[in-house]
Amino acid sequence: MNQEFSDEHRRAAEGSFHAPASIFFLYMDECMRTFAILELESMCMEKIPSRLISLGKRLRKSSIRCLGVKPNWSDYPEELQRAIVSAEKICYPGPVYSEIFEAAGLSVFPRNYYHFLGNKVAQTDLFNLLEISHPRTKIYYGRDRLKRIESDFPYPFIAKTPLGSSQGSGVFLIRRPEDLSQYLETHNPAYIQEYLALDRDLRVVVIGARLVHAYWRIHREGDFRNNIAQGGIISFENIPAAALDFAMHVALKCRFDEVGLDICEYAGKYFVLEANMVYGQEGFRKKGLDIHQIIADLFST
């Protein structure tokens, strides 16, 4: 896509993400644990680059060495410990080390990633705090939830699994009290959102303050969900520049270094529906793109 962005977004993109070529990455997929341990031992004999370090398999297709995660900080040889704490940036450190490194004042990429991964409650709170357009949403705990929800939302409305759901599997259209009662039996807290009658939404992927891909997700007949995993159709036609500008605004304001944003236009206004830190790859495959190579290229420039 060759959409032009505002000068404000361009300046923000240029200033918010720097990835020097001399990158030392720290990562270990569980299925490669033994191999990575051998790599760690052998590299201790070499000079360790000190500018950047990473943990994530997101760069497994790059030429950058990915070493892996140890269960204990003390498991790292002292030379690797020194390289980590002196790094300019630590990439894809995983949920545990991400919080530890940030608490220690180290710079982590991607920011605001693991805490918001699959956490719709935290995402909604962030959008509301930053006054980002988001469908009216409320969280309900405790007793008498059905009565309180019915007093706040007219039927139909949307109910979601607040934590961990993906690919549309935890999204429900609540049409009547019986639907709501069934939802409440298995969900506490209840995540309730106003229903916007849409035939599509726009998935926009932003990495390192760069827009890397965007496509429409159009729902199949008889389903209110636009998710590709639920039968939605991908289209690259007529994507408005204003929608892309809005997505960039959301990513920059929320400090999301890697995110797949679901954007919609309703009643002449753009809304962010959800932030996906793990997002489907079908839209990339349809365009002949490799997300892992895209990320590797971002770090090599």
Segments and roles (model prediction):
Residues 171-251:
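Phosphate-binding site of ATP-dependent enzymes
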Residues 5, 17, 24-27, 35:
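Aromatic (phenylalanine/tyrosine) cluster motif
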Residues 265-301:
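C-terminal active-site "lid" helix and adjoining low-complexity regulatory extension at the edge
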Residues 256-267:
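A short glycine-rich, hydrophobically flanked beta-strand micro-motif that places a catalytic Asp/Glu
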Residues 8-10, 19, 30:
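Short hydrophobic alpha-helical segments enriched in small aliphatic residues
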Residues 40-137:
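Conserved N-proximal alpha/beta basic substrate-recognition cap immediately N-terminal to
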